[in-house]
Amino acid sequence: LDRQVSRWPRSLRLAMTAGAEHYTATLGHFVLAGEAANGFHPTMQKLVVWHATEEVEHKSVAFDVMQAVGIGYPTRILGFLLASLVLVSFTAVGSRMLMRQDGLDRSQIRTARAELRRRDDPELVRATGRQLKAYFRRDFHPDQFDDREMAARRLAQIDLEMRAA
């Protein structure tokens, strides 16, 4: 896949990067705003929350570069759709592979996925969907979702916990 994608126009690859960053920032927001990392091992929880803050902090970098070099709306949307396809495919295949490596059979994998869906906050899932759909607005910019203060608070919380440990 890398070899094929490397032949695509740079403008499309940059648009895919900006689209993927919108996904990771949206998922980062989802982690920071909800309880997605609750129940994780404490060290893993801190890592996941830290990574979510990192995604939120740089969410507009590729988008700003894309705008600065004049990439238009059609390429931006095509890049987002291709990034969506890649992310969903890799996530599905990767999660199944990791669960199988852990020795889970198909029934256990279905149970694990059902448990994740059960734990989802429906309003937070809808808000996440709205945030992803916003990318299709012509006037969209990632900074329209101002969640950097929330990220800074969560990072400060982790820092306090680490110092107390």
Describe the residue ranges of each PLM region.
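Non-heme di-metal
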Residues: 1-165
